[in-house]
């Protein structure tokens, strides 16, 4: 496929040196296919260092921790280290902060909607920080039964979103 694209001057990021696809948005970058189809291939090996765009390898991260203070209002992060930010600014700031410390790398095999398995390697430094911080706040503010309900509903909600059922009746009921 890479040769076909090159021959027909179709611009793609995949190449002989980067034999995988990537998809990027504000929350994460996903890497799939190509060399990643081999489940025994170590995605985090030094030879694959160039694949990652948002984060350094934990081995290359500073040995000194960097502390971050997040401010939440009605469940949303509104400030990082005392600086008020819009959602875009929060994600950009946390992606940079987490990325320089090797936070947020994930290697997993997914079960797709059609039943096939697919390996994905992800970078989500800002998402990892926000998720962890929000869970800590929830542990302080939610009672046990509400947390149990959350833990039973969140996987189904996430599955519906993952499958593209954003406008399905189930999603509408979850928003009530």
Language-model features and meaning:
Residues 1-175:
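Nucleotide-activated chemistry modules centered on ATP-dependent adenylation/adenylyltransferase
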